[in-house]
Amino acid sequence: MEKKTSCLLCVLTALLLAVLYLWAALRPGVWLRDAFLYRQADGSFSGRDAYAAYTMQIAQTENGAEVEFTLDGETRRYRLESKAEGMSDPGVKIEQDGVVIFTGTALGDPGDAILWREDDGGLADEVNVIVNGEYRRSDLWPSCSWLYHVAVGGRRETRGSVAFLLPIGALVVLLVLDVRFPLLFWNLRHGLEVYGGEPTDWYYAMQRVSRITGTIGVFVLAAMSFAVH
């Protein structure tokens, strides 16, 4: 009876952890470098990283979108026009607080498009990399490409990488089978070779090690799913 109670508690704990993980991993939003901006109930986005706190409001327009982006209390307003009048198709124009900061074209799917400048044919944005925590405040603002992907292209992501769900699920299934049927893998390997044999103490020792390793692997993969994007 005591063993059944312990097993039931373990199962309930595992289910609770699984539900909490899925809830956290599948929360919608969008990545801005290493900051994840969670989608809120009112349609806005907010999040923070080691450098600043961010909020964003997006309003769709007839041929693009308007974005209000706040960084640590400072707000900038962007207007994005796709297929802007007098421009090539698909022409893009982006304004920041009424000043044009980009005109050019978008190549590819809007959610992952490459933006090319009309004047010099170069990419819309410079690549800014924060090294050893050294940065300029201007590096923290969203790039033209990111704004286009999110506001016009409708890019949406989840907090955790869903690519990790398959290996996590596979490990969990193997652990459940090994606990529920302790001799399953031994029988699969030796059942046709040995009749009436028994696993050795070494087998049981390695089985315990594999269970511990598998459990650690599940938590490591779960943690990695939040770090990789």
PLM regions and their residue ranges:
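Generic detection of intrinsically disordered/low-complexity segments and helix-coil linkers/edges
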Residues: 15-17, 25, 110, 180, ...
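Long, solvent-exposed extracytoplasmic domains/loops
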Residues: 34-154
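Hydrophobic secretory-pathway targeting helix
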Residues: 1-38
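Cytosolic-side membrane-insertion boundary helix
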Residues: 149-167
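Alpha-helical transmembrane segments forming the membrane-embedded cores
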Residues: 163-229
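Short, flexible coil/linker elements and helix-boundary hinge sites characteristic
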Residues: 27-28, 43, 195-196
